[in-house]
Amino acid sequence: MKQLTIEAFKAMLDNALKQIKAREEEFSKLDAVIGDGDHGTAIVAAMTAVNKSAQSGTEFKQMLGDMGMDVMMEVSGSTSTLLGAFFLGMSDHAEGTELDAAGVKVMFAGGLANVQQQTQAKRGDKTMMDALIPAVEAMQACTSDDIKEVLNAGAKAALDGAEATVPMKANFGRCLLYTSPSPR
């Protein structure tokens, strides 16, 4: 894919919501080990708000900005704050109705930069940053002009980064209170 259109991006968001909904119970069970067990419900609510907001989008900047604001206004908690910051950062670095691979890379880097302004967490702290930072770095390093290859490089790095957190000691959030190895 040489161009990412608004419609293709919306389809990706729809697919992401379906995947998250399918794992809602799993996410809540994992969260219940150290928290209140509502993460599955919260992330589904956040992605539902994102998808609802995206449906009226006609160009990237406006759509991503609306997605960021809506998720922060409609869903409480750190997940929605950080997800909102990510989309708002993306919106500052995306123009028009189509993006090429270079534009996608710039958009994701803008999202990461904005999240980094909202949190002190960094790679190695056992947070979402352990997946997000390597994902964006891998996307930047990908030399292909095929957007699917760029996104796949980011997805693989995100998964590897998340899996690398299993033996880590947390430096933020409720995980600070949990000393056993991460549940799988």
Language-model-derived ranges and their functions:
Residues 2, 27, 61-64, 101, ...:
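Non-transmembrane, aqueous-exposed alpha-helical and coiled segments at domain scale
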Residues 167-177:
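C-terminal binding/interaction regions
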Residues 114, 135, 147-164:
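Extended, low-charge hydrophobic alpha-helical regions
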Residues 1-54, 67:
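Generic N-terminal targeting/processing segments that precede catalytic cores or assembly contacts
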Residues 78-90:
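Ordered, amphipathic secondary-structure segments that act as subunit-interaction surfaces
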Residues 101-140:
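A structural-propensity feature for long, helix-poor, extended segments
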Residues 178-183:
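Conserved small/polar residues in nucleotide/adenosyl-binding loops
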